[in-house]
Amino acid sequence: MASPRRSEADLASPARGPGSGPPSPPHPGPDSARPLSRITSAAASPPPPGQRTAEPPTTISIPRTLWRLSIPLYITHPSLPNTPFITSLPRVSYLSLLLPRIRAFLPPSIPAPTSFHHEGIALRALPLGLLVDLYQPTLPWRLTVDQGDDWHVGDTFLNGVKEADFVRNGHAKQIMGMSKADTTALWNAVRDADYPAWARINARLLNPSTPIKHVPLRIYIPSSGGGGAGGATPAGSFRVMQTLVPPRTANRIPQTLGPTLRDLLPVLFPSSRDPVLANVVLHGAPVPFSAPLEGLMREAAYPDGWLCLTVVPL
């Protein structure tokens, strides 16, 4: 595991060098923990079924703030370790979207890379911010590109949207009822970091005519690693817990994070009020245990609709 990562704000103006793309948007001033903490009150009461949500009465909405967060990257190829491709990418985006630029940057004699690696670990096609939460690298994140699994990230994204829609409603009629143009526009908005375009389409997914049944929740639990020898868990691996969690309790009270963690992972989370043995982070920030799950989903889920929490031992 890499050394503890620094906050995005620590590198508001990442170094630039060969291969740098256009200047990246500045990192927002507030730490990402601040918008997440507002979810406890701002999103505690979801809108009535069928009513689209408006942005909360804050200077900058929580989702818009999260879409502005970016990660500085320092990318090299094994054959050119001293020729870095330096850029940054939004936390909600995907590394594979950089591959066309990296391929154009590398000499033609080098086979086109297809995968990204962190300390020898091939990275999965997950949102960049989730990868940072999992591996906690020092920033800028030093990655290598090489041959490996070819990513079809657009298809992966849309499959995730369909799965999240099914979990929310018990069916995927919301996304399946959209036109091809709309689903393409949804992915293009993520690809282009176009928050307004994404939000317009996503509002239709989050506000069906009936109340949602479950929150699309995935909890990522990193392993301690063991190098993989003798059957030990390979370094950098993690397991994913996914279960059906209703947005409200049997008493119709909004379901909050703390009791959910205690019920699903009682060994790691013996208390429903405070982190004792472990915490969870989302978009680089600890999440208040009092935050309602539906509020977290509406305000801080990744663009495919999944609320992805990473367990961090204390």
UniProtKB/Swiss-Prot annotation:
User: How does this protein sit in the membrane?
Assistant: Peripheral membrane protein
- For the cross-link Glycyl lysine isopeptide (Lys-Gly) (interchain with G-Cter in ATG12), the position is 162
- Chief localization class? membrane
Localization per record: Preautophagosomal structure membrane
Region named Disordered:
1-59
Residue ranges that the Swiss-Prot or TrEMBL entry lists as coiled coil:
none
The record ties this protein, via InterPro entries, to: Atg5 (IPR007239), ATG5_HBR (IPR048940), Atg5_HR (IPR042526), ATG5_UblA (IPR048939), Atg5_UblA_dom_sf (IPR042527), ATG5_UblB (IPR048318)
> What ranges does the record list as Pro residues composition bias?
20-29
Post-translational modification summary for this protein: Conjugated to ATG12; which is essential for autophagy.
A Gene Ontology molecular function term of the record: Atg8-family ligase activity
Q: Which UniProt keywords apply?
A: Autophagy, Isopeptide bond, Membrane, Protein transport, Transport, Ubl conjugation
Question: What domain of life is recorded for the organism?
Answer: Eukaryota
Respond yes or no to whether keyword Nucleotide-binding is given for this record. no
Which Gene3D superfamilies does the entry mention? 3.10.20.620, Autophagy protein Apg5, helix rich domain, Phosphatidylinositol 3-kinase Catalytic Subunit, Chain A, domain 1
Cellular-component GO terms for this entry: Atg12-Atg5-Atg16 complex; autophagosome; mitochondria-associated endoplasmic reticulum membrane contact site; phagophore; phagophore assembly site membrane
- Relate the outcome reported for changing residue 152 to R: In strain: Guyane 11
Family per similarity comment: Belongs to the ATG5 family.
Under the subunit heading, UniProt states: Conjugated with ATG12.
Please explain the role this protein plays, according to its UniProt record. Involved in cytoplasm to vacuole transport (Cvt) and autophagic vesicle formation. Autophagy is essential for maintenance of amino acid levels and protein synthesis under nitrogen starvation. Required for selective autophagic degradation of the nucleus (nucleophagy). Also required for mitophagy, which eliminates defective or superfluous mitochondria in order to fulfill cellular energy requirements and prevent excess ROS production.
> What's the protein name?
Autophagy protein 5
Q: Which organism is it from?
A: Pyricularia oryzae (strain 70-15 / ATCC MYA-4617 / FGSC 8958) (Rice blast fungus)
Protein encoded by which gene: ATG5
